[in-house]
Each structure stands twice: as C-alpha cells, then as structure tokens.
Amino acid sequence: MFSYPSSHELSERGIMSETPTNRAIPDAATQVDIYRRMIRIERNDDLTRQQIRRGRITAPYYSARGQECIPSAISVLLNNDDKICTIYRGIHDMVAKDMPLRPLWAEICGRVDGTCKGKGGPMHLTHPETGVMVTTGIVGSSMPIANGFGWAALLDGTKQVTVAYFGDGASNIGAFHEALNLASVWKLPVIFVCQNNGFSEHTRYENGTSVDFIAKRAAGYGMPGYTVDGNDPLDVYAHAHAAIERARAGEGPTLLECKTFRFMGHVFGDNDAYMTKEEKAAAIEADPLPRFRQKLIDDGVASAEQLDELTAKIEAEVNDAIDYAMACEFPSDDELRRDVFAEEIPA
C-alpha cells in the first residue's frame, strides 16, 4: 500500500500541501528534463502568440504561460503508453508529453499534414503515438473520457495510467463529480490533475467554488486529494510520482490540485482587467521558469551555458515546426466530407 499522511502542511505561500511518504526526488538528469519540457512549452507559447500578432494564425489561442511546471513535472514520469486527456487550454500539456511539434503546428495552422488533417485546430489536437489522446473544448469532459482509457487499461491488464487535465472551473461541472465517483468505485488508474489558476474564464475562484481547496472534494469520493504548489517542479513531481505509483499498483485514482496562475487573459487578446496589477506582479515574481533555472544552477545540476544551449535548441525546434506548417497545404474541399460519417458521402 502507498501511504499518505492525513494532515495538511502549509507552505510559505499558504498553499495546503501533503507530502507523500518516501517523497520522491528527481535525480539531476530528470530535473534537467523537467526544465527542458518547461522551456519547450514557454518557447512554443511565445512563438504561437507572435504568429497570431503577425496574422499568420487566425484560430483562438488559450495561453498557459505561467503553468509550465505542472505538466512538465508530471509528463517526465509517464511513458508513451501512458495517456493524457486535456482541454482547450492544453497545448502545454501536449508539448510537455513530447508530442512532435511539426504535426502539432500543422494542425494549429489548419493544414492537411496536421494531426487531424487540419480539421481540429488548436482546440482539438491528438497524437496517440505519444499518448495524447484527446483535446476537448467542452469544460469538464476530459475526465469521463480519461475514465474510459483507465477502464480499457484494467480490461487489458496493463500498467498504463491516464492523466486527466482540467481547470478549476471544471471542478464545478457534473462530469467532475461523476468521473471521480466512478474512478473510485472501479479503482481506475486515473490521475485527475486540476490546474487551478484562480479564474474560471473571467470568474474568480472564490466567486464560483464552494471550497477553499478543490482537493478537499476527493474525500467525498474515497480517494486521496492533495493541493500542491503548481509553481514548484519538485513538489509537483513528488505528488505525481506517488499518485502514478499508486495507480500502477491497482489502488485507484488520485486528485491533484496544482495551484498556479496564468499570466494572460482567458483567451489571447481578451481584456484581463479582472486581474489586479498586484496579482500579475506576484505571478511574475513566482514565475516557475527563472526560479527553477536558478535552482538548477545554484545546485550545480546544470550551468547557465548548458541551459542557454538547451533553450536555443528548443527555439530552433519550434521555428522549424512553424516553417514546416506554413509550407503545408490546406485541406481540399473533398476533405470536408471525410472522417465525418462511417461511410464516405459522395460529392
């Protein structure tokens, strides 16, 4: 059995956090890999916004700048056989899972070489080869879908786990409660990860959620629930490690609430006046990227030169994917009728 303490500890930021017994600490190579994934998200996010400003992309974009730590510290623990189900603000989850950037960008740009032949766009991406199973624009729907993959893993007798990513607003959707209940009853190997950035679209957390910590809701469904510092890679890693090991051992699901903050509005270009200047300043101060970079340097895990070289390599990877996507063709008119019905509809 994997043991979890029953008491809550308060971190320096007042975040409720429970530490799993035998807290896992990533080795040096794993810490650098977490940072690599974080930088991959940040560079991809920044260059996406640049392309939108230049008018080269016209699709809606939901930035996750500030939330890089969460999927990076989780994905480093997953195999390609392990699956993720995410939401419209989920490109960072896919990038952290090491989804190839060329087909990702081709899909974002609506090109035929995209993961969904240009029909899905940035809100409906998939790449089963790396375990990216579904991106959904329906709030809360990633969780029951994840249960389906968890049930399949049980039937197949594998050790696969599925991670369901969602936001704090989705914790108030009926699908959240139904999914957690079923996952607990059937002991599904699913980890429910709430990326709590404090806002449900434009609504403050406290104006739409009845509990101070979403993780408390896990108790009602007989599963462990933990609120962790979503800006601390080592905290996320330790809790995700325990949750994943528990799931692989057949002991069922875990709810992880990762407290964080998104630097931008709900959708790129919207008015974020509902965020105060003080909140934005505090978020930038708590930016996980420079903090973790400095920690790696201070601890002797990597040098500044090594991390700069890694960043340059990743930026080149993103730029290559952009150039590739822009050179791809748009889908033909005939493609509109494909992948819609079981039998192809004649023109």
Predicted regions span which residues?
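A broad, low-specificity signal marking well-ordered, structured residues that form hydrophobic/aromatic
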Residues: 7, 123, 254
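N-proximal short alpha-helices
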Residues: 21, 115-119, 256, 265
